[in-house]
């Protein structure tokens, strides 16, 4: 899997969860203490989030890191 493919899957999972819980980019930015520009880049797939960003986003969205990154599915 390429980095680009990883980002695309990350975006898909984050945006689905955001819709499910009724969060927009601005709210996610505020709750994660990340700039709106950074969240926007993550959600456009133009920037790969750091591990700490993935952890932070997973906590805010109440998702496990495995659920958010699908690594759990890869090792089943």
Model-derived features: positions:
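DNA-binding alpha-helical recognition surfaces that contact promoter or target DNA
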Residues: 16, 41, 70
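A short, Lys/Arg-rich alpha-helix, primarily the initiator
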Residues: 1-24
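Residue-level signal for the short linker/turn that defines the boundary of a DNA-recognition helix
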Residues: 23, 49-52
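The alpha-helix within a helix-turn-helix
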Residues: 18, 29, 58
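DNA major-groove recognition helix of helix-turn-helix/homeodomain DNA-binding modules
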Residues: 52-67
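Short amphipathic recognition helices of helix-turn-helix/homeodomain-type DNA-binding modules
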Residues: 67-76
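Short alpha-helical DNA-recognition segment
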Residues: 22-41
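Residue-level detection of the helix-turn-helix DNA-binding "recognition helix"
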Residues: 19, 33, 44-46, 73
């Amino acid at each position: 899997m390429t980095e680009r493919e990883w980002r695309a899957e990350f975006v898909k999972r984050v945006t689905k969860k955001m819709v499910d819980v009724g969060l927009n980019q601005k709210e996610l930015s505020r709750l994660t203490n990340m700039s709106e520009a950074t969240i926007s880049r993550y959600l456009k797939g133009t920037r790969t989030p750091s591990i700490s960003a993935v952890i932070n986003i997973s906590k805010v969205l109440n998702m496990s890191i495995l659920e958010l990154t699908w690594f759990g599915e890869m090792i089943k």
